[in-house]
Regions:
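His/acidic metal-ligating clusters that form di-metal
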Residues: 66-73, 176, 192-287
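Sec-exported extracytoplasmic/periplasmic mature domains
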Residues: 50, 63-70, 100-104, 137-144, ...
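Stable alpha-helical elements in mature extracytoplasmic
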Residues: 38, 54-62, 77, 88-98, ...
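Structural recognition of the beta-strand scaffold that forms the well-ordered cores
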Residues: 41-46, 72-78, 82, 105-110, ...
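N-terminal active-site segment of His-dependent metallophosphoesterases
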Residues: 30-91, 227
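A short C-terminal boundary segment appended to hydrolase-like catalytic domains
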Residues: 320-343
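Secretory targeting and sorting signals
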Residues: 1-30
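Extended active-site neighborhood of metal-dependent phosphoesterases/phosphodiesterases
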Residues: 86, 91-207, 289-318, 322-325
Length: 343
Protein backbone atom coordinates (compact mmCIF):
# COMPACT_ATOMS: atom_id res chain seq x y z
CA UNK A 1 0.00 0.00 0.00
CA UNK A 2 2.74 2.43 0.98
CA UNK A 3 4.61 1.72 -2.27
CA UNK A 4 1.47 2.55 -4.27
CA UNK A 5 1.06 5.79 -2.34
CA UNK A 6 4.65 6.78 -3.14
CA UNK A 7 4.14 6.00 -6.83
CA UNK A 8 0.92 8.00 -6.89
CA UNK A 9 2.60 10.95 -5.18
CA UNK A 10 5.41 10.82 -7.72
CA UNK A 11 2.88 10.85 -10.55
CA UNK A 12 1.15 13.84 -8.98
CA UNK A 13 4.48 15.63 -8.79
CA UNK A 14 5.26 14.99 -12.45
CA UNK A 15 1.80 16.19 -13.45
CA UNK A 16 2.17 19.39 -11.51
CA UNK A 17 5.62 20.16 -12.87
CA UNK A 18 4.59 19.55 -16.48
CA UNK A 19 1.43 21.63 -16.23
CA UNK A 20 3.33 24.73 -17.26
CA UNK A 21 3.95 28.09 -15.72
CA UNK A 22 0.41 29.34 -15.29
CA UNK A 23 1.17 32.80 -14.02
CA UNK A 24 4.73 33.55 -15.09
CA UNK A 25 5.03 37.08 -16.32
CA UNK A 26 1.90 38.28 -14.54
CA UNK A 27 2.05 41.31 -12.32
CA UNK A 28 2.49 39.88 -8.84
CA UNK A 29 0.27 40.58 -5.89
CA UNK A 30 1.98 42.61 -3.19
CA UNK A 31 1.63 42.40 0.59
CA UNK A 32 0.94 45.07 1.60
CA UNK A 33 0.11 47.45 -1.23
CA UNK A 34 2.47 50.29 -0.47
CA UNK A 35 5.75 51.65 -1.77
CA UNK A 36 8.66 49.21 -1.85
CA UNK A 37 12.39 49.78 -1.98
CA UNK A 38 13.82 49.96 1.54
CA UNK A 39 14.22 47.47 4.36
CA UNK A 40 11.03 46.13 5.91
CA UNK A 41 10.02 43.29 8.21
CA UNK A 42 7.34 40.67 8.66
CA UNK A 43 6.44 38.58 11.70
CA UNK A 44 6.23 34.78 11.81
CA UNK A 45 4.46 32.70 14.46
CA UNK A 46 3.23 29.13 14.58
CA UNK A 47 1.94 26.34 16.82
CA UNK A 48 0.05 28.88 18.91
CA UNK A 49 -2.18 29.12 20.89
CA UNK A 50 -1.80 25.79 22.71
CA UNK A 51 -3.89 25.32 25.84
CA UNK A 52 -5.97 27.59 28.03
CA UNK A 53 -3.20 29.96 29.14
CA UNK A 54 -1.99 30.67 25.60
CA UNK A 55 -5.55 30.99 24.33
CA UNK A 56 -6.29 33.61 26.98
CA UNK A 57 -3.05 35.47 26.23
CA UNK A 58 -3.24 35.31 22.44
CA UNK A 59 -5.05 38.67 22.04
CA UNK A 60 -2.09 40.29 23.84
CA UNK A 61 0.28 38.60 21.40
CA UNK A 62 -1.71 40.09 18.54
CA UNK A 63 -1.60 43.53 20.17
CA UNK A 64 2.17 43.33 20.63
CA UNK A 65 2.77 42.41 16.99
CA UNK A 66 0.37 45.15 15.91
CA UNK A 67 2.49 47.62 17.91
CA UNK A 68 5.74 46.66 16.15
CA UNK A 69 6.27 49.51 13.67
CA UNK A 70 8.67 47.49 11.52
CA UNK A 71 6.23 44.67 10.77
CA UNK A 72 4.37 44.98 7.47
CA UNK A 73 2.47 41.68 7.63
CA UNK A 74 2.19 38.52 9.74
CA UNK A 75 2.54 34.84 8.81
CA UNK A 76 0.95 32.16 11.00
CA UNK A 77 2.42 28.76 10.14
CA UNK A 78 -0.53 26.71 11.33
CA UNK A 79 -1.50 24.60 14.34
CA UNK A 80 -3.96 26.99 15.96
CA UNK A 81 -4.61 24.42 18.72
CA UNK A 82 -2.76 21.61 20.44
CA UNK A 83 -3.08 18.00 19.35
CA UNK A 84 -5.30 16.86 22.21
CA UNK A 85 -8.15 19.38 22.19
CA UNK A 86 -11.48 19.40 20.37
CA UNK A 87 -11.64 20.69 16.78
CA UNK A 88 -14.95 22.45 17.29
CA UNK A 89 -16.67 25.10 15.23
CA UNK A 90 -16.74 27.26 18.35
CA UNK A 91 -12.97 27.06 18.70
CA UNK A 92 -12.42 27.91 15.04
CA UNK A 93 -14.66 30.96 15.48
CA UNK A 94 -12.69 32.05 18.56
CA UNK A 95 -9.37 31.93 16.73
CA UNK A 96 -10.82 33.63 13.66
CA UNK A 97 -11.97 36.48 15.92
CA UNK A 98 -8.43 36.74 17.32
CA UNK A 99 -6.99 36.72 13.79
CA UNK A 100 -9.35 39.56 12.92
CA UNK A 101 -7.58 41.65 15.57
CA UNK A 102 -4.43 41.79 13.41
CA UNK A 103 -4.27 45.24 11.86
CA UNK A 104 -1.86 44.37 9.07
CA UNK A 105 -2.30 41.56 6.54
CA UNK A 106 -2.23 38.06 8.01
CA UNK A 107 -1.25 35.06 5.90
CA UNK A 108 -2.34 31.82 7.57
CA UNK A 109 -1.17 28.44 6.33
CA UNK A 110 -3.06 25.47 7.73
CA UNK A 111 -1.61 23.03 10.29
CA UNK A 112 -2.37 19.39 10.99
CA UNK A 113 -3.80 19.93 14.48
CA UNK A 114 -6.83 21.79 13.16
CA UNK A 115 -7.94 19.11 10.70
CA UNK A 116 -5.58 16.19 9.98
CA UNK A 117 -5.51 14.92 13.57
CA UNK A 118 -9.17 15.64 14.37
CA UNK A 119 -10.03 11.94 13.96
CA UNK A 120 -8.54 11.36 17.42
CA UNK A 121 -11.16 10.69 20.11
CA UNK A 122 -9.83 13.52 22.30
CA UNK A 123 -10.17 15.87 19.31
CA UNK A 124 -13.84 15.02 18.91
CA UNK A 125 -13.61 12.05 16.56
CA UNK A 126 -14.31 14.15 13.46
CA UNK A 127 -13.87 13.24 9.82
CA UNK A 128 -10.70 15.23 9.01
CA UNK A 129 -11.91 16.05 5.50
CA UNK A 130 -15.06 17.64 6.93
CA UNK A 131 -12.92 19.69 9.31
CA UNK A 132 -10.68 20.79 6.43
CA UNK A 133 -13.73 22.01 4.54
CA UNK A 134 -14.81 23.94 7.61
CA UNK A 135 -11.33 25.48 8.05
CA UNK A 136 -11.46 26.74 4.49
CA UNK A 137 -14.93 28.16 5.02
CA UNK A 138 -14.01 29.99 8.24
CA UNK A 139 -10.48 31.20 7.55
CA UNK A 140 -10.54 31.81 3.78
CA UNK A 141 -13.84 33.63 3.19
CA UNK A 142 -12.35 35.92 0.52
CA UNK A 143 -10.05 33.91 -1.75
CA UNK A 144 -7.26 36.03 -3.13
CA UNK A 145 -7.22 38.24 -0.03
CA UNK A 146 -5.31 37.85 3.22
CA UNK A 147 -6.85 38.01 6.64
CA UNK A 148 -6.22 41.07 8.82
CA UNK A 149 -7.94 44.44 8.98
CA UNK A 150 -5.69 45.80 6.22
CA UNK A 151 -6.31 42.86 3.92
CA UNK A 152 -4.02 42.59 0.90
CA UNK A 153 -4.40 40.84 -2.43
CA UNK A 154 -2.52 37.62 -3.10
CA UNK A 155 -2.56 35.05 -5.89
CA UNK A 156 -4.66 32.09 -4.71
CA UNK A 157 -5.30 28.55 -5.89
CA UNK A 158 -8.96 28.91 -4.95
CA UNK A 159 -10.03 28.02 -8.49
CA UNK A 160 -8.44 24.60 -7.91
CA UNK A 161 -10.06 24.23 -4.49
CA UNK A 162 -7.06 25.35 -2.43
CA UNK A 163 -7.67 28.94 -1.26
CA UNK A 164 -5.01 28.53 1.41
CA UNK A 165 -2.18 28.19 -1.14
CA UNK A 166 -1.13 31.74 -1.97
CA UNK A 167 1.81 33.65 -3.35
CA UNK A 168 2.82 37.30 -3.57
CA UNK A 169 5.77 39.57 -4.20
CA UNK A 170 7.28 42.41 -2.25
CA UNK A 171 10.41 44.44 -3.11
CA UNK A 172 12.00 41.84 -5.38
CA UNK A 173 11.25 38.90 -3.07
CA UNK A 174 8.80 36.16 -4.08
CA UNK A 175 6.73 34.57 -1.30
CA UNK A 176 4.52 31.48 -1.15
CA UNK A 177 2.46 29.92 1.64
CA UNK A 178 1.66 26.28 0.89
CA UNK A 179 -0.48 23.69 2.66
CA UNK A 180 1.90 20.96 3.81
CA UNK A 181 1.15 19.45 7.22
CA UNK A 182 2.68 17.10 9.75
CA UNK A 183 1.43 13.54 10.26
CA UNK A 184 3.23 12.57 7.04
CA UNK A 185 1.29 15.27 5.20
CA UNK A 186 -1.96 13.61 6.42
CA UNK A 187 -1.05 10.07 5.34
CA UNK A 188 -0.97 8.64 8.86
CA UNK A 189 -4.00 6.33 9.21
CA UNK A 190 -7.01 7.71 11.01
CA UNK A 191 -8.27 6.17 14.24
CA UNK A 192 -9.40 2.58 13.72
CA UNK A 193 -7.72 2.20 10.33
CA UNK A 194 -4.56 0.31 9.42
CA UNK A 195 -3.94 2.36 6.28
CA UNK A 196 -5.09 5.64 4.73
CA UNK A 197 -8.60 5.54 3.28
CA UNK A 198 -9.12 6.11 -0.46
CA UNK A 199 -10.66 9.51 0.29
CA UNK A 200 -7.72 10.42 2.52
CA UNK A 201 -5.21 9.43 -0.15
CA UNK A 202 -7.09 11.28 -2.88
CA UNK A 203 -7.03 14.48 -0.82
CA UNK A 204 -3.27 14.20 -0.28
CA UNK A 205 -2.59 13.53 -3.96
CA UNK A 206 -4.63 16.52 -5.10
CA UNK A 207 -3.17 18.85 -2.48
CA UNK A 208 0.39 17.69 -3.17
CA UNK A 209 0.00 18.38 -6.89
CA UNK A 210 -1.34 21.85 -6.08
CA UNK A 211 1.52 22.58 -3.68
CA UNK A 212 4.12 21.54 -6.24
CA UNK A 213 2.44 23.69 -8.87
CA UNK A 214 2.46 26.63 -6.45
CA UNK A 215 6.17 26.14 -5.75
CA UNK A 216 6.84 25.89 -9.48
CA UNK A 217 4.83 29.04 -10.24
CA UNK A 218 6.48 31.01 -7.43
CA UNK A 219 9.96 30.29 -8.75
CA UNK A 220 8.82 30.98 -12.31
CA UNK A 221 7.52 34.36 -11.18
CA UNK A 222 10.78 35.02 -9.33
CA UNK A 223 12.85 34.31 -12.43
CA UNK A 224 10.56 36.34 -14.68
CA UNK A 225 10.74 39.34 -12.33
CA UNK A 226 14.47 38.92 -11.54
CA UNK A 227 13.70 38.60 -7.85
CA UNK A 228 16.58 38.42 -5.41
CA UNK A 229 15.16 35.64 -3.21
CA UNK A 230 12.30 33.21 -2.74
CA UNK A 231 10.58 32.50 0.59
CA UNK A 232 8.31 29.50 1.20
CA UNK A 233 6.19 29.19 4.35
CA UNK A 234 4.47 26.03 5.55
CA UNK A 235 3.53 24.10 8.67
CA UNK A 236 5.29 20.75 8.33
CA UNK A 237 8.87 20.26 9.47
CA UNK A 238 10.11 18.01 6.70
CA UNK A 239 13.64 18.02 8.18
CA UNK A 240 12.87 17.58 11.88
CA UNK A 241 16.18 17.75 13.81
CA UNK A 242 14.49 16.47 16.98
CA UNK A 243 14.02 13.05 15.33
CA UNK A 244 17.37 11.27 15.54
CA UNK A 245 16.44 8.24 13.44
CA UNK A 246 13.71 9.25 10.98
CA UNK A 247 11.92 6.48 9.11
CA UNK A 248 10.94 7.08 5.51
CA UNK A 249 7.61 5.38 6.19
CA UNK A 250 6.75 8.39 8.37
CA UNK A 251 7.94 11.00 5.84
CA UNK A 252 7.26 9.69 2.34
CA UNK A 253 4.37 12.10 1.84
CA UNK A 254 6.87 14.95 1.84
CA UNK A 255 9.25 13.46 -0.74
CA UNK A 256 7.79 15.00 -3.92
CA UNK A 257 7.50 18.39 -2.20
CA UNK A 258 11.10 18.31 -0.99
CA UNK A 259 12.17 17.23 -4.47
CA UNK A 260 10.30 20.18 -6.02
CA UNK A 261 11.84 22.67 -3.58
CA UNK A 262 15.29 21.19 -4.17
CA UNK A 263 14.96 21.23 -7.95
CA UNK A 264 13.65 24.79 -8.11
CA UNK A 265 16.15 26.09 -5.54
CA UNK A 266 19.09 24.54 -7.40
CA UNK A 267 17.99 26.31 -10.58
CA UNK A 268 17.53 29.68 -8.85
CA UNK A 269 20.41 32.14 -8.68
CA UNK A 270 19.55 33.67 -5.30
CA UNK A 271 18.90 32.46 -1.77
CA UNK A 272 15.81 30.43 -0.90
CA UNK A 273 14.26 30.48 2.57
CA UNK A 274 11.87 27.91 4.05
CA UNK A 275 9.96 28.79 7.23
CA UNK A 276 8.08 26.07 9.12
CA UNK A 277 6.60 25.20 12.48
CA UNK A 278 5.54 21.72 13.62
CA UNK A 279 8.58 20.62 15.68
CA UNK A 280 8.13 23.49 18.18
CA UNK A 281 11.82 24.34 18.79
CA UNK A 282 13.62 27.21 17.07
CA UNK A 283 16.15 25.93 14.58
CA UNK A 284 18.03 27.37 11.62
CA UNK A 285 20.02 25.28 9.16
CA UNK A 286 20.71 24.34 5.55
CA UNK A 287 18.81 21.05 5.35
CA UNK A 288 20.04 19.99 1.91
CA UNK A 289 23.66 21.14 2.18
CA UNK A 290 26.50 18.79 1.29
CA UNK A 291 26.75 16.01 3.86
CA UNK A 292 23.16 16.33 5.08
CA UNK A 293 21.42 13.04 5.86
CA UNK A 294 18.28 14.42 4.23
CA UNK A 295 19.82 14.29 0.73
CA UNK A 296 19.86 10.49 0.56
CA UNK A 297 16.77 10.22 2.75
CA UNK A 298 14.65 12.05 0.17
CA UNK A 299 16.60 10.88 -2.88
CA UNK A 300 18.02 14.32 -3.75
CA UNK A 301 20.95 13.75 -6.09
CA UNK A 302 22.95 16.90 -5.39
CA UNK A 303 23.35 19.42 -2.55
CA UNK A 304 21.25 22.58 -2.48
CA UNK A 305 23.50 25.08 -0.66
CA UNK A 306 21.27 28.11 -1.27
CA UNK A 307 18.32 26.64 0.69
CA UNK A 308 18.03 27.86 4.28
CA UNK A 309 15.23 26.93 6.64
CA UNK A 310 13.99 28.32 9.93
CA UNK A 311 11.70 26.58 12.43
CA UNK A 312 9.80 28.90 14.76
CA UNK A 313 9.24 28.24 18.44
CA UNK A 314 5.84 26.76 19.24
CA UNK A 315 3.72 24.86 21.74
CA UNK A 316 5.07 25.39 25.28
CA UNK A 317 8.03 27.25 23.75
CA UNK A 318 5.84 29.77 21.93
CA UNK A 319 7.12 32.74 23.91
CA UNK A 320 8.25 34.95 21.05
CA UNK A 321 7.58 35.94 17.48
CA UNK A 322 10.15 35.91 14.72
CA UNK A 323 10.78 39.34 13.25
CA UNK A 324 12.23 38.78 9.79
CA UNK A 325 13.89 41.80 8.23
CA UNK A 326 14.22 42.01 4.47
CA UNK A 327 17.25 43.79 3.02
CA UNK A 328 16.44 44.03 -0.70
CA UNK A 329 19.78 45.62 -1.50
CA UNK A 330 21.94 43.97 1.17
CA UNK A 331 24.35 41.03 0.91
CA UNK A 332 22.10 38.95 3.19
CA UNK A 333 18.53 39.26 1.95
CA UNK A 334 16.82 38.03 5.13
CA UNK A 335 17.87 38.33 8.75
CA UNK A 336 15.75 37.47 11.76
CA UNK A 337 15.51 37.81 15.50
CA UNK A 338 13.21 36.34 18.12
CA UNK A 339 11.19 39.01 19.91
CA UNK A 340 10.00 37.86 23.37
CA UNK A 341 6.33 38.19 24.16
CA UNK A 342 5.68 40.93 26.67
CA UNK A 343 3.47 38.65 28.74
Amino acid sequence: VRRWHRAALAAAAVGALTAGVVAAGQASASVPAEADGGNYAFAVIGDIPYGDAQIANFPKVVEQINADPAVRWVDHLGDIKNGSSVCSDEYFALIKADFDRFVRPLVYTVGDNEWTDCHRPNNGGYNPLERLARIRQVFFPRPGHTLGQQSARVFSQADQGFPEDVRWERADIAFAAVHVVGSNDSLLPWTGNAAPTPEQTAEVLARTAAVIQEIHDTFADARAHHDKAVTVLTQADMFDPTVTDPKFADYYGFQPIVAAIARESAAFAGPVYLFNGDSHVYHSDNPLAAGSKWLSFYGIDRPVPNLSRVTVDGSAGANNYLRVTVHPHGPQVLTWTRVPFAS
